[in-house]
Amino acid sequence: MAEEKLLVKRDGEFCYPIYFENDFSFLSQALTDEGLAGKSMCIVSDSTVAPLYADQVKAELLKVTDHVYQFTFPAGEAHKNLDTVQDLFQCLIENGLDRKSLVVALGGGVTGDLSGFGAAAYLRGIDFIQIPTTLLAQVDSSVGGKTGVDFRQFKNMVGAFHQPRLVYMNMATLQSLPEREFGCGMGEILKTGLICDKDFFDFVCANYKVIRTMDPEMLAVMIRKCCAIKAGVVERDPKEQGERALLNLGHTIGHAVEKLMNFNLLHGQCVGIGLGAAAAISRERGLLTNGEYEQICHSLKLYGLPLYVEGLSPRDILAATKKDKKMEQGQIKFILMDGLGKSFIDKTVSDQELLVGIHAICR
């Protein structure tokens, strides 16, 4: 693929580029172009991704620096915590990384969140870059500068806004994704269309057969469009003071389910379940027709996402929902849909309405 990139802005000024490639061969040039050559670098990856791609990435980094280190942690959301961050700090300290060094996040959303938070906190903040290898990370967690880790049973409770210096997407890494992981990314993509772009939502639904074959050209079109939509939202509201909160559609109840399931369901699966709950509440308010509600549920099924969760008490889900980190003065900032492709923030969703959504997803 010829070099393609999307420029993400903040306050109208250039912030960082997102590179779209089909291999790692342009990474060294991208680092040079962004003024990152010569830095000491530490690749952060998990035990699943490191054996697949760490050597390839290290070879590219060694073209622009003599000092490349590696930190690998056990894969899974259960290790996205302060204990792993402490281990990362120990690695950075032992290898002498300083304020001019660079953290290289290689992997999915867990790796990106953890690496970014570690970079934000280490020596009061050092540079980092994102090399997302899952669809979920490419379209969601690698764009926007949100970083963080889970604290005990509370998801993303400790974190910081820390923008990467660049994002480098090798879309060929998607070909190694298990189908379940691919579906998780599609949940976030469907969410993006439902928030603010009905045409994009319709496109993703209409082309599901080609998309599910992981056709490279179709994936490239879809990923670039999704990143452009999210980047636009982030540019206008980098620290989630308003519009950016819309990106949390499906996440409030979704995070509660994820926590109660002890992370045995993947994040994207829980977001899909949360989308169904938000759609049910929106329908209850008369904001979605029955047909639109069914269309949302059908879109999730097209990509193999679960619509229901088993074995959880609706009251337990409600209690967990009300511990969401986005609570403000005892009120949930809930995202509702007003038709397909339009959403808004609502602070008046009652417990009774929440239970309507929760009962819609419980079996």
Describe the predicted segments one by one:
Residues 2-7, 187-189, 287-363:
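C-terminal charged capping/lid subdomain of soluble metabolic enzymes
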Residues 207-315:
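Active-site segments that bind and position negatively charged phosphate/pyrophosphate groups
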Residues 1-101:
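ATP/NTP phosphate-donor binding region
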Residues 62, 94, 163-166, 172-179, ...:
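Generic secondary-structure signature for well-ordered alpha-helical cores
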Residues 117-210:
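A glycine/threonine-rich phosphate-anchoring loop and its flanking beta-alpha core
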Residues 89-106, 115-130:
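Non-catalytic interfacial helical region
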Residues 110-117, 138, 256:
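Short glycine/serine/threonine-rich phosphate/pyrophosphate-binding segments
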